[in-house]
């Protein structure tokens, strides 16, 4: 792995979210050349969710937003969001294996998806509608969940597609 920090590599340019939030930013540009060079030498870039504005001020960025912005910029086929939840759950708290934009909006309207899961799902929908074929939310607390997602037909967690 290779650690990517904003000060060292400056791969994420941000704009401030708002004055009320202080040093919280939204990505406006991802410099993919640095990431592509790291990937070419078979290393995995581990990116801190920090970016710099036009004045080189450091801003914090939501990690899911950074991951989505990088996936879109790299034109990734799939994005995995590793979380502390199984994925999207139905009313009976059972895992929903796959949802699309329409189903996600229905689940939000029905308040099945609520709270902090709403911005996570909205980010996933944005990523899926901007060139990434699918975003999966998987439970990082489960042993081998990433391998299960990558190497099985069934997958792990909830797959979100356009």
Residue ranges and their predicted role:
Residues 141-148:
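Low-complexity, intrinsically disordered Gly/Pro/Thr-rich segments
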Residues 1-141, 154:
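Nucleotide/pyrophosphate-binding catalytic subdomain
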Residues 97-99, 148-162:
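Conserved, well-ordered active-site substructure
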């Amino acid at each position: 792995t290779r650690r990517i920090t904003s000060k060292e590599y400056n791969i994420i340019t941000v704009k401030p979210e708002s004055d009320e939030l202080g040093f919280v930013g939204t990505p406006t540009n991802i410099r993919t050349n640095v990431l592509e060079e790291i990937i070419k030498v078979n290393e995995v870039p581990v990116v801190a969710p920090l970016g710099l504005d036009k004045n080189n001020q450091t801003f914090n960025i939501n990690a899911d937003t950074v991951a989505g912005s990088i996936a879109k910029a790299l034109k990734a086929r799939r994005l995995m969001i590793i979380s502390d939840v199984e994925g999207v759950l139905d009313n009976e708290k059972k895992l929903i294996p796959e949802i699309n934009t329409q189903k996600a909006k229905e689940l939000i309207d029905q308040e099945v998806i609520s709270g902090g899961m709403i911005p996570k799902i909205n980010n996933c929908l944005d990523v899926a509608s901007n060139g990434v074929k699918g975003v999966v939310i998987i439970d990082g607390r489960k042993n081998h969940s990433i391998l299960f997602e990558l190497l099985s037909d069934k997958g792990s967690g909830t797959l979100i597609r356009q």
